[in-house]
Amino acid sequence: MLGWIKRLIRMVFQQVGVSMQSVLWSRKPYGSSRSIVRKIGTNLSLIQCPRVQFQINSHATEWSPSHPGEDAVASFADVGWVAKEEGECSARLRTEVRSRPPLQDDLLFFEKAPSRQISLPDFSQEEPQLKTPALANEEALQKICALENELAALRAQIAKIVTQQEQQNLTAGDLDSTTFGTIPPHPLPPPPPPPPPPLGLHQSISAVDLIKERREKRANAGKTLVKNSPKKPEMPNMLEILKDMNSVKLRSVKRSEQDVKPKPVDATDPAALIAEALKKKFAYRYRSDSQDEVEKGVPKSESEATSERVLFGPHMLKPTGKMKALIENVSDS
């Protein structure tokens, strides 16, 4: 049975023109030889069916007399026409039927633009009408008047607070002055606050004036305290002291011979002991310096004076021989 099926398949492939080896072993993932069906389809001589073409015609030219009735090209308008012809058992194109004159209802239907039917309610009609500008202006004026009244009340409260604070300060000062005297039997009640002014404008002016008066009083009180308090000694300014340093001239003072001579050294002075030890340690440097002075022709008196004056210096350093090597290298180069 299997052998018979293989022979049948080979015969079919031979008639088509495809070899069995190429079908089984070719793995081409693209092109006309990708599958057996494609190979069979390419080798068979099949006639392709003609494609259906549709033409969209406008509604204005559909019923016009100038439109040719012998147009054999089908369009989407034929679909609607066929749907309307429900009584006929067979469907016919519009070109096969005699054209009838258009009715007025049809013309009105085609002339009207397609409109969308909305099932939702129209809320725009239910909205209340807008208020007139006169009513809006009246409401704005009422709000402004209310704000002005609130501002006037706030200014009156500020004026009351300021006056109460001033009265408290005055009563506190009177109590401080009378503490050293007799104590009154009963404290006097504070005076009632003054009535608020009638208009908001006068209220604002009075509050501002009270604030200014308080500031002036504070400033005057500070000035009097500064005047009455004793002045502190001012710190000297170093810039003013050092301003004339460049113009200062020093005069030369001649010293006496007693001042030039070295003072006798105390044996118990630690500084003298350290100086003697350093002299002994760095004596070679002192000798080299004295030899240089002799070579330069310095008189003995000056060399002795310098040796007596200069106790410490580079002549006390210990020679290492590095300076001589450097000097020789420089002289050779």
Curated annotation (Swiss-Prot):
Q: Describe the family membership recorded for this protein in Swiss-Prot or TrEMBL.
A: Belongs to the MTFR1 family.
Record-linked InterPro entries: Mtfr1
The entry's protein name is Mitochondrial fission regulator 1
Keyword terms? Mitochondrion, Phosphoprotein, Transit peptide
Q: Which domain of life is it from?
A: Eukaryota
Q: Which residues carry this modification: Phosphoserine?
A: 119
Biological process annotations from GO: aerobic respiration; mitochondrial fission; mitochondrion organization
User: Which cysteines are disulphide-bonded?
Assistant: none
UniProt entry tagged with the keyword Transcription: no
* Subcellular location(s) of the protein: Mitochondrion
- Enumerate composition-biased segments (Basic and acidic residues): 286-307
Name where it mostly resides: mitochondrion
